[in-house]
Amino acid sequence: MLVFMQITLAHIGARIGSRDDYEPSIQNYLERSSTVARCRTEAFRSEETFLDFLDKQQGRTPAIAVLLDSRGRQMSSEAFAAWLGARRDEGSQHIIFAVGPASGWSDAARKRAHLLLSFGQMTIAHALARLLMAEQIYRACTILTGHPYHSGH
């Protein structure tokens, strides 16, 4: 199967040399998602550098920015898979999921987002939010391809 969509899992507030115990699991989930999309991670020192990166994303279609935000829309895994599948079917080339800075996203960043997505009302550590997002991307890919991973939910 040819894969034409790219997914980037970005996070803000990266520190050079910082240790992230979740990184191997994040990479594992993203590698396993390759049936639907090419996946990668990106780290940014600030929201400003992330927004500059967003401005430079070009292709046949504009990049879709999904910001994880406590005020965002909550979805079931099935609804998220349907949303991701619809973007794929529309021909979207690049979807960027981003975990924001510790102080939260600015109003300007929220306005640039195509979707604000929330895991719920609880506050979640940024590294854990990245892991949860990577797992949900993988789960969505398995739902879209009929893989049994999600069937035991």
Q: Where are the regions a protein language model picked out?
A:
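Short, low-complexity, intrinsically disordered N-terminal peptides in bacterial proteins
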Residues: 1-6, 56-61, 152-153
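Generic structural signal for residues in well-ordered beta-strands
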Residues: 7, 38-42, 116
